[in-house]
Design a protein with these regions (language model features):
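Right-handed parallel beta-helix
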Residues: 8, 50-61, 89-105, 128-152, ...
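Glycine-rich beta-solenoid repeat tracts in large extracellular/virion proteins
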Residues: 11, 15-16, 20, 42-48, ...
């Protein structure tokens, strides 16, 4: 569990465009022009994490990048919280509670890589035969305030299994 302690203001994570990692769905998405891999910035990254609770934090990701424009198509995707399922089969019991996520300045054009306040997605496992399908069982989001985030507020996004849905 990650939680505040004591009294006073919430502990604050100010990522400022740092926390850079590489997202890769493991193959093209449903349209060849959709972005399926690339670098992005997250304040909190839960990568193949389960049985975890993140509570009572203030989270921002508002970088100071010289000459970066809001309408710039190649602007970096940014999140407050990214949750990724990939190499551990079914991920259980992920709780986000009483988070104040704001001023996450992502890419307004890209809706495929994680981008926004809270964003969850599923990537192709390195060895699906061994791990099973990557998925979630028990996502709980309670009492979170998400504001001034680009592109999404809270989203359960793309999956490498997109072709199974019609």
């Amino acid at each position: 569990m990650v939680d505040a302690y004591g009294e006073g203001a919430l502990p604050r994570i100010e990522t400022d465009g740092n926390g850079i990692w590489y997202q890769n769905y493991g193959g093209h998405l449903d349209n060849v022009v959709h972005t399926w891999k690339g670098y992005l910035s997250s304040a909190v990254l839960l990568y193949d994490a389960e049985y975890i609770s993140i509570r009572n934090l203030e989270i921002t990701n508002n970088p100071c990048v010289k000459n970066e424009r809001l309408n710039q198509a190649d602007r970096m995707n940014r999140t407050g919280v990214s949750v990724i399922a990939k190499n551990h089969g079914t991920l259980h019991e992920i709780e986000l509670d009483h988070l104040y996520i704001h001023d996450v300045e992502g890419n307004i054009y890209d809706k495929h890589l994680n981008n926004g306040g809270i964003y969850m997605s599923v990537s192709r496992p390195d060895d699906e035969e061994k791990t099973g399908i990557a998925r979630y069982d028990g996502i709980h989001i309670h009492h979170c305030k998400v504001e001034n985030c680009r592109r999404w507020g809270i989203a359960a996004g793309y999956t490498y299994q997109h072709d199974k849905f019609t």
